Every structure is written in C-alpha cells, then in structure tokens.
C-alpha cells in the first residue's frame, strides 16, 4: 500500500509541476499569443491576401515612420513615457494604414486562399515583428515590464534584425 501512496504522490507532484510550468510558460508568452490571435482573426476577416498586405504595409509603415521629419518632435511633445509610446504607436498605425490601403487593392485578388498553417505562421511572425517594434521603436519596455523570457528574446539590439526580416522570410516560404 505504501508504494501505491508513493506513486500517487509522485503523479500528483508531476501533474501539479507540469500544470504550473505550463501556466508560467503561457503567462510569459501571453503578449505574443494575444497579438497572434488578433493577426489570425484579421487574416480571416480581411479575405484573400489580407495578412500578406498587412505584413508588407508594416514595412511601408516602418519606412514612413522613420523618415517622417517630425516624428521626434511629435513624440517629444508627449510628457510621460506612456503618452510618448501611445503617440508613437498612433503615428506608426497611420503610417501603416496608408500603404495598407493601396497594397490591399493591388494584392487582394492575386493570392489564392491561404490554409490555416500559413496564416498561423504568418500571424505569429507579424506578432513578433510588432513586439520587436514595440521594444526598439516605441520603447514600450519603459512603461511595461515584460517577463524575462520576452526580454531575452526581444530586447537585445542584435536580435532586432532577425525579428524584422522574419515576416519577409515567412512570405517567401508561404506565399507563391
């Protein structure tokens, strides 16, 4: 009977440790999961080529954001880091919407229907692209403390390039 109690204790310990580890993992990557679900929903809502248009528009928005001569002046007008982050996100959203509007018209009919897996991967890559921009362009880490796991993946400047090109690599593999 003692061995059955011992096995029961081991199983309970394993299950609770596994559940705790799964919860911590989910909590650490919740921001990526939320952004990915939003991107996935957008890809289904926007029709054929919507996620492709959005990813390409992100690059156009990034370009417009960085070359706009008044970006720093407008962001500097915000007093607190929170207001500065909100202003920079709004500027990026406007700079992304302009190319998206035209790219969607050009790309919309050019692609067949993407299956779930390409949409899932492209949504994940778009979400990580936005999170990398949040770290390096919008400085969201000044107003929100991300979990260490996310900080290790997105905070180093050397990783920004890889998160930046990841959606393009995804487009190369999944859109043909």
Task: List each model region and its residues.
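Alpha-helical transmembrane segments and their juxtamembrane interface "caps"
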Residues: 2-176
């Amino acid at each position: 009977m003692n061995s059955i109690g011992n096995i029961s204790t081991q199983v309970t310990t394993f299950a609770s440790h596994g559940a705790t580890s799964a919860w911590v993992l989910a909590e650490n990557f919740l921001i990526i999961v939320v952004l990915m679900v939003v991107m996935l929903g957008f890809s289904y809502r926007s029709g054929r080529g919507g996620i492709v248009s959005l990813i390409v528009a992100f690059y156009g928005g990034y370009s417009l954001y960085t070359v706009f001569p008044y970006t720093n002046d407008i962001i500097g007008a915000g007093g607190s880091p929170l207001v500065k982050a909100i202003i920079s996100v709004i500027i990026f959203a406007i700079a992304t919407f302009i190319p998206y509007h035209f790219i969607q018209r050009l790309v919309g009919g050019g692609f067949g229907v993407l299956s779930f897996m390409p949409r899932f991967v492209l949504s994940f890559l778009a979400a990580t692209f936005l999170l990398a921009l949040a770290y390096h362009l919008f400085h969201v880490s000044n107003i929100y403390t991300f979990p260490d796991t996310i900080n290790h993946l997105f905070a180093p400047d050397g990783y920004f390039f890889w998160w930046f090109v990841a959606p393009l690599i995804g487009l190369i593999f999944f859109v043909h």
